[in-house]
């Protein structure tokens, strides 16, 4: 196969993947009771990433919408386990809610590898949500690989911000 054919085939596959993706809608804000004013700041976790049962009841932990990963890893960090339990509880309590898990990677590695890594990261978050009682029918995993960086500098600090899954609540 010559280079031109390979390039055309890769472009065709990318076009097909983009054409098959769903349009993501922005989620409505988290519901709060009418007589309760929204909190101005997130309460400090009691230990590294842990929330108290009261936090789970007030949805304070739902503010964690970005899950970060280590370099070239798709394993969920322990500090995000409580956030997974909180989001799963939200999904259980609201069966009509839907969530898109947007997997991302830093710029290191090939485009194809990073697309796969972003998908594996999204699937890891999906599995954690399901293990905590979330329904697979409420979850949609999308991988953007290295295509949607939040930081464009070439530094470890910046790359760490790009190795993530973003949780987006979507309309039904």
Question: Where in this protein do the model-derived segments appear?
Answer:
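Bacterial N-terminal signal peptides that target proteins for export
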Residues: 1-8
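Pyridoxal 5′-phosphate
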Residues: 10-13
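C-terminal motif of bacterial Sec signal peptides marking the signal peptidase cleavage site
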Residues: 16-19
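Periplasmic peptidoglycan-binding/tethering modules of Gram-negative envelope proteins
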Residues: 21-98, 172
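Extracytoplasmic/secreted proteins, especially bacterial periplasmic and envelope-associated proteins
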Residues: 79-86, 112, 116, 120-124, ...
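A non-catalytic structural micro-motif
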Residues: 95-104, 119-150, 163-172
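Short beta-alpha junctions and helix-cap segments that line functional grooves
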Residues: 151-155
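A generic structural micro-feature
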Residues: 157-161
């Amino acid at each position: 196969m010559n280079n031109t054919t390979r390039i055309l085939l890769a472009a065709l596959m990318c076009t097909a993947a983009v054409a098959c993706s769903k349009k993501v809608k922005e989620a409505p804000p988290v519901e709060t009771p009418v007589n309760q004013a929204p909190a101005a700041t997130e309460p400090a976790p009691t230990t590294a990433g842990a929330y108290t049962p009261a936090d789970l009841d007030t949805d304070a932990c739902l503010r964690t919408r970005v899950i970060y990963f280590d370099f070239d890893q798709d394993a969920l960090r322990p500090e995000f386990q409580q956030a997974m339990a909180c989001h799963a509880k939200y999904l259980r309590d609201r069966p009509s809610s839907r969530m898109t898990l947007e997997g991302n990677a830093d710029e290191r590695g090939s485009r194809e590898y990073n697309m796969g890594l972003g998908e594996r990261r999204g699937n890891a978050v999906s599995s954690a949500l399901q293990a905590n009682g979330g329904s697979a029918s409420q979850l949609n995993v999308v991988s953007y690989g290295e295509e949607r960086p939040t930081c464009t500098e070439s530094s470890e600090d910046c790359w760490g911000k790009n190795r993530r899954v973003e949780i987006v609540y979507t309309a039904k």
